[in-house]
Amino acid sequence: IQHQTSELWMKLVIHELAEAMGYIRSDELESSFKILARVKHIQHQLLSQWDVLATLTPSEYVQFRHVLGTGSGFQSAQYRRIEFMMGNKDRNMLRVHAHDPDATAALTKALEAPSVYDEFLRHLARRGFAIPEDLLTRDVSEAHEANAQVVEVFKGIYQNPEKHWDAYEMCEKLVDVEEQFA
């Protein structure tokens, strides 16, 4: 049951992240705030499900452990898709799903699409923030590397939240989601 409910929650996270990215692409940050808050709550629900299993003693757990197999939640195609949508990209992770053509196709599409973070950087560039052009045209299937210019942009947003309220709030929402994901 745990696995099935987790997969349902992850399916909802994927849907919500796609919706949020659409709003960010359309420069409607405010519309994405509630969605990202919902994602944070879904993530919390996913994590809190494990509290029930924590009540089991080792001897109770051993009684049914054999039926769980050797799989890991990290092998879930939906989990990996969420990772890619959030920007944690690694092409090598496709290999885990090579046996499943549908999962591989969905994951490849997510890997090669801009992440939530990519869309936010593009939004900031459209607003005139100094996002380096090479970040906007980079291969989005690769993981991000730290960039001093982007750090300066975020520093400016945080030093003047009243002037850049929606960008500031989006930064906070992304941190909230990332903290729940990590």
Predicted regions: what is each one?
Residues 1-182:
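Surface-exposed peri-terminal alpha-helical interaction modules
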